[in-house]
From Swiss-Prot:
PANTHER family linked: ATP SYNTHASE DELTA CHAIN
Xref: Gene3D superfamilies: N-terminal domain of the delta subunit of the F1F0-ATP synthase
A GO CC annotation given for this chain: proton-transporting ATP synthase complex
InterPro entries: ATP_synth_OSCP/delta_N_sf, ATPase_OSCP/dsu
The organism of origin for this protein: Hydrogenovibrio crunogenus (strain DSM 25203 / XCL-2)
Topology versus the membrane: Peripheral membrane protein
Subunit structure as annotated in this protein's UniProt entry: F-type ATPases have 2 components, F(1) - the catalytic core - and F(0) - the membrane proton channel. F(1) has five subunits: alpha(3), beta(3), gamma(1), delta(1), epsilon(1). F(0) has three main subunits: a(1), b(2) and c(10-14). The alpha and beta chains form an alternating ring which encloses part of the gamma chain. F(1) is attached to F(0) by a central stalk formed by the gamma and epsilon chains, while a peripheral stalk is formed by the delta and b chains.
Homology family: Belongs to the ATPase delta chain family.
Protein name: ATP synthase subunit delta
Keywords of this entry: ATP synthesis, Cell inner membrane, Cell membrane, CF(1), Hydrogen ion transport, Ion transport, Membrane, Transport
Record-linked HAMAP family: ATP_synth_delta_bact
Subcellular localization, as worded in the UniProt entry: Cell inner membrane
Amino acid sequence: MAELITIARPYAEAAFEVAKEEGKLVEWSEQLANLSAIVSDETMTAYMVNPSVTSEDVLKLLVDVMDSNLNSEVKNLLNVMAENKRLDALSEVAEVFEELKATEDKRVRATVISARKATVEQKKKLSAALNAKFDAEVEITYEEDPSLISGIKIKVGDWAIDGSALSQLNKLGAAIAQ
């Protein structure tokens, strides 16, 4: 997965720049989301990994399925990805594009994992702190993981912090083992 994100990033960044210059961020976002949904389908995934199916075959199918719902610039992106045999990273391109769009809109997505359900007051404080840190409107998804024992883990894009008791115990165990 990390490898596909790395492959996808330059395509997504180039697509984002074109979409931004053309004033078509929403249009690109919708088209990439639709393409991502198509390539994520089980049948399509099986088709794409079939050794007898070429990148050009996949490209033709994607263009045929989307028909007139693709603008010429998105078709160009698909052509370049097909030429480089990178259509398998299409979902990740859509994902990175959305991250870039959110940053442009001063929105950031965060995942907060805690050992127990956060209270309303804790959520307010955490939201305010993250909004200030990232100078953006942070959309937080909360998850529970009792294995953390206590504390929280926060992930925002490439930035992460692990303040869980489990992490501290693992570090202590590693230090003792040395």
